[in-house]
Amino acid sequence: MLKWNAIPLKGVNGVSFGMPRSEVRIVLGGKFKEFKKNKFSKNTADDFGVCHVFYTPDNKCEAVEVFSDCEISVNGKVLFPVDILSAKKQIEDLKEDSGSYISRKLSIGIYAPEGTPESILFGEAGYYE
């Protein structure tokens, strides 16, 4: 399992929010596939297998969603994959929202439709506004 660090509102594993797409691709390396998340997407995203990276219309990184084959630590504590109760202890304002758990203050979203976290998203400030 990969082990990455995240800094809420700043970035994940060396990828900073606001970083140009070309730099993100260098930092994460490897193969990627460009895709549109849905018909409302304003830009394409990059699928690196272990994560998806989302971009603003001007190709700046605005969010990174990481999947369960990667361990994410924040301030030296594992935040993902852990159960929702453990995540709530680390993120005080984590609120349930249609199968996801969202922290608007930290721009963090945990996708857990069946109660078990499947992915965690870190976004730039205001991502969930």
Where would I find each of the regions flagged by the language model?
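Short helix/turn-capping signatures at newly exposed starts of structured segments
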Residues: M1-E129
